[in-house]
């Protein structure tokens, strides 16, 4: 681990089974299926942001994001966030999501009502891998949610 890397949170299975996540970068929201765990110790995930996506610019600017695992009952709003552009509209306000301060992140806020949340900071961008997607290794710096797997209602894909 490089000296400038943050202390990562302990691994958590709050996201199992694999599911569609709702990502926040700053105050912007987007649904994401292109993610996976790449390390348990240190706890890291891989995110793939579409090239040209407004959230990609925000991720490069803020170097942080949050990954939310929303209940099945929120699936319509989560999916709808992918049809709106954060360049033109405040998605949280338009879709009725409540944003809360993060524990460790400076500019990115958290979505109320998530069954689990991972606070993430950029470890590195993987360059020259894809023309369509920008892959990022993200360090998990905080984990929220302790709902047992049998009590969760995930948005599976």
Predicted regions and their residues:
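Basic, polyanion-binding surface patches
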Residues: 1-157
């Amino acid at each position: 681990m490089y000296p400038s890397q943050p202390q990562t949170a302990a691994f958590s299975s709050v996201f199992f089974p694999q599911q569609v996540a709702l990502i926040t970068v700053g105050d912007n929201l987007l649904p994401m299926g292109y993610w996976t765990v790449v390390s348990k110790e240190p706890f890291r995930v891989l995110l793939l942001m579409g090239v040209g996506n407004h959230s990609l610019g925000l991720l490069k600017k803020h170097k942080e994001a949050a990954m939310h695992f929303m209940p099945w009952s929120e699936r319509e709003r989560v999916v709808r966030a992918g049809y709106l552009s954060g360049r033109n509209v405040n998605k949280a306000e338009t879709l009725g999501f409540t944003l809360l301060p993060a524990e460790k992140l400076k500019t990115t806020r958290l979505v109320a009502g998530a069954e689990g949340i991972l606070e993430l900071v950029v470890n590195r961008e993987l360059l020259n891998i894809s023309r369509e997607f920008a892959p990022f290794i993200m360090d998990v710096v905080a984990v929220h949610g302790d709902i047992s797997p049998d009590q969760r209602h995930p948005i599976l894909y």
